[in-house]
């Protein structure tokens, strides 16, 4: 109908001797040029903000560039040196442990929180809005509050534990290497939990109630309904949420840098923090860029696996 209207307008203009040029008439009738006109600005913006920095990082990773020096081409020497570096191997291990632990906690706790929010009767909107607060507050600001709660000298957490007579000493949350990793995982989980909970809640709301009634009439209890109705229907949503969260968690910078700056003894360094310290603070731009590019194949593998899971879940449905 819209196409006929446009063609009619063009015919009227032609009858009055005011026919547009062939290029303009084609532009009005065909949808493809209009689509290109709309996506063009976004495409060039992404090209400038994403593609150009990526290509520049690729060049830096293949050079011995330092701060204030352009450097020269060294091939894969930066990557070879990193693979022989104990700090980088520790960073790789930290990133895997951090991402796996945080994703597991966010998935389990997010599902529990989504189920609780789904069953709310009173103050539903107020509580759901409050749950989003950790995700809304700027990361650096909220992490500073967490640092104040866990820092060794005036730790509110330690004061509370000692006041309740749970412990009688100050727990070194941030100076201890293993407790520091536990702390950054805890804060990252707190930060990302609302994203899981609200997204899974949207998936729960979309599940037809008739399926639960049918399962209940077949004798399925609450656990049976959860495993045989809720989980299968939430698999596509879970796969997408885990995919995005894996990308954000693996590339996390703010939480780790504000809390520990990668310490103590490099036990909480992730790719982003180690790349920042090596490339900007130490001035080794080439090696810092090489560290950041190690994220690319890992993220590519994560995306590939998760997309396969989404496709399988869609085929199952």
Predicted regions and their residues:
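Transmembrane alpha-helical segments of polytopic membrane transport and secretion proteins
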Residues: 1-39, 122-124, 307-317
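A structural signal for multi-pass alpha-helical bundles of membrane permease subunits
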Residues: 34-317
């Amino acid at each position: 109908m819209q196409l006929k209207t446009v063609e009619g307008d063009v015919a009227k203009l032609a009858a009055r001797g005011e026919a547009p040029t062939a290029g303009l008439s084609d532009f009005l009738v065909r949808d493809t040029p209009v689509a290109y006109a709309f996506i063009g600005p976004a495409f060039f913006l992404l090209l400038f903000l994403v593609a150009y920095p990526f290509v520049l990082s690729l060049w830096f990773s293949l050079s011995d560039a330092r701060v204030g020096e352009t450097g020269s081409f060294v091939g894969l020497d930066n990557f070879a040196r990193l693979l022989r570096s104990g700090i980088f191997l520790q960073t790789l291990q930290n990133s895997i442990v951090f991402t796996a632990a945080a994703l597991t906690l966010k998935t389990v706790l997010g599902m529990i929180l989504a189920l609780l929010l789904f069953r709310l009767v009173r103050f539903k909107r107020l509580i759901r809005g409050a749950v989003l607060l950790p995700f809304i507050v700027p990361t650096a600001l909220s992490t500073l509050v967490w640092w104040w709660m866990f820092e060794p000298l005036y730790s509110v957490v330690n004061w509370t534990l000692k006041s309740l007579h749970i412990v009688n000493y100050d727990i070194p949350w941030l100076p201890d290497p293993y407790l520091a990793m536990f702390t950054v995982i805890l804060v990252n989980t707190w930060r990302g939990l609302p994203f899981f909970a609200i997204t899974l809640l949207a998936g729960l709301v979309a599940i037809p109630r008739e399926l639960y009634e049918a399962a209940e009439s077949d004798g399925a209890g609450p656990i049976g309904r959860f495993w045989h109705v809720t989980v299968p229907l939430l698999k596509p949503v879970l796969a997408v949420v885990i995919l995005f969260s894996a990308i954000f968690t693996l590339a996390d910078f703010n939480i780790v840098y504000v809390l520990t700056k990668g310490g103590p003894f490099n036990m909480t360094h992730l790719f982003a923090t180690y790349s920042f310290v090596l490339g900007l603070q130490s001035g080794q731009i080439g090696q810092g860029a090489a560290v950041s590019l190690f994220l690319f194949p890992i993220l590519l593998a994560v995306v590939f696996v998760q997309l396969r899971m989404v496709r399988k879940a869609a085929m199952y449905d």
